C-alpha cells in the first residue's frame, strides 16, 4: 500500500519529469521478467532517507483521514437535506391539492359579492347620513325659531317689568264712592275698600289654548262642553294637539312619555315619565314630580333600567313601568319606587325586532297599552299572518288572560291605542291630516272602519297612547310631546 501511494504521489509530476522518465525490462535472478519505471524528481537532487519517506507517507495518511471526514460531513448534510425535502413533501400533501381554476373562480365570485354588500352598506350609510343632515337642518331652523321666541318673550318681560315699576311709582286715584254710588247690578264692588291709598297689584298671564280644549264639536256639528266625558263610550272625536315639551337633542326624535292612570304612593297624577328611544342601548327613564318640571325639562330623578328597552311601546300603570326587552319578545314589569324587576314574561309567538312593526318601523312589534280595564299588549304572530293580535295581561305576573285576533294588518297602520276595550288604529304617522281609521271591539269581536280626523302636526308620530284617568291621548310627534283631547259617545 505505501508503494502504491508513492506511485500516486509521483503521477502529478509526470509532465514535469516526462523527459527524464525511463522504462527498463530485465530478468531477475530467478529468470522472471521485470519492468522498471523510473522518473527523476523535479525538486530533489538526491533520494531522501527512509525516515523522510515515512514522514511523507504519514502526511498522506493524514490527508486521507481529512478527506474521509469531509466525505462523512457531506453525507450528513445530504441526509439532512433529504429529511427537509421529505418534511416539505409531507406538508404539501397535508395542505391538499393546489387550487383549481374552478376554485379560484368561486373565490373571485365570493369576493365580488362581499364587495357588492360593502357598496350597498356604504350607500345605506350615506342615505342615513343625508337624513341626519336634513334632520339637523330642521332642528337648526327650529332652534332659530325658539331663539326668536325667547327674545320676544324677553322683550315682553322687560316691557312688563317696566310697566310694573311705573305703576309702583304712581298712586291709585283717591275716591270716596260708597255703595250708594254703585250702579245697579254691580253691588259686589261695594265690598272693596277704596278709601285707603293702598292698592293691590294683580298679575295675569295670557296662555294660548286651542278652542277645542274648552269646547268640542259633536258629530252633529254643534259645540259641546266637556261635561259628560267621564265613563266609557265609543271614540267619536279627537281634538287639536297641544304641545307640552320638545326634546333637546336628536335622541328624542322618537320616544315615549306617560303618566300613571292608577297612581300609587309616592307618585301622583302629575308625576310624568319620559324615555328618549333613539339608540341601541336605551336605559334612561326621566321622572318628573310635577307637570311644570316636565315642561321646563328638569327631572327629579333618572332611572337606569337593568336591561335596555325596545322602541316606544312602554307604559306606566299602578306604580310600575312595563316595557319590552330589547331584541326579544319578553315583557318586563319594573317597579319604579324600588327600582327592581318584579316580573318578566315572553309573549308566545310574538314577532319582535322588525318582524311585525307599525308602518313607521322603529321595531314597534310589541306595543303595550292601558285602558279603563287594565293592561294590554298589541302585537302579531306568524300564525296571524301579520294581523293585529290583542292580549289582556295580568299586571302582577304578566300572564295572558285572554287573546283576540283581528283582521287589521299591523304593518298597514301607523299606531294603535285602546279605549274601553276597543282597539283604535291611526292611518298615517306622517300625514298632517290622518284619520283614526279602524276600530275593533273586544266585547263583540267586530271591527269597522272609521274616518275620525287625527292631526300629525309635526308629521312623525312614533307613539300614541290613551290615558284613562285624564281621558286624553298622549303622543310623541317628531321630538314633540303632545296631548289630544277626545270625545266619547255615551254608552
From Swiss-Prot:
Any one GO CC term of this protein is: mitochondrial inner membrane
**Site (Cleavage) residue list:** 213-214
**What residues bind Ca(2+), as annotated?**
367, 415-416, 464-465
Family matches, as SUPFAM superfamilies: YWTD domain
> Region entry Disordered: which residue ranges?
151-189
Q: Which UniProt keywords apply?
A: Calcium, Cell projection, Cilium, Coiled coil, Cytoplasmic vesicle, Disulfide bond, Endoplasmic reticulum, Extracellular matrix, Glycoprotein, Golgi apparatus, Lipoprotein, Membrane, Metal-binding, Mitochondrion, Mitochondrion inner membrane, Mitochondrion outer membrane, Palmitate, Secreted, Signal
Give the sugar-modified residues: 43
This entry's Gene Ontology molecular function terms read: metal ion binding
Q: Which Pfam families match?
A: OLF
Disulfide partners:
232-420
Residues in domain Olfactomedin-like?
A: 231-490
Q: Which residues belong to the signal peptide in this entry? A: 1-18
Query: Does the keyword field hold rRNA-binding?
Result: no
- InterPro entries (UniProt xref): Olfac-like_dom, Olfactomedin-like_domain
* Residues forming coiled coils: 98-171
Primary role: Secreted glycoprotein regulating the activation of different signaling pathways in adjacent cells to control different processes including cell adhesion, cell-matrix adhesion, cytoskeleton organization and cell migration. Promotes substrate adhesion, spreading and formation of focal contacts. Negatively regulates cell-matrix adhesion and stress fiber assembly through Rho protein signal transduction. Modulates the organization of actin cytoskeleton by stimulating the formation of stress fibers through interactions with components of Wnt signaling pathways.
Q: How does it assemble?
A: Homodimer (via N-terminus). Can also form higher oligomers. Interacts with OLFM3, FN1, NRCAM, GLDN and NFASC. Interacts (via N-terminus) with MYL2. Interacts with SFRP1, FRZB, FZD7, FZD10, FZD1 and WIF1; regulates Wnt signaling. Interacts with SNTA1; regulates muscle hypertrophy. Interacts with ERBB2 and ERBB3; activates ERBB2-ERBB3 signaling pathway. Interacts with SNCG; affects its secretion and its aggregation.
What protein name is recorded for this chain? Myocilin
Q: Which organism is it from?
A: Macaca fascicularis (Crab-eating macaque)
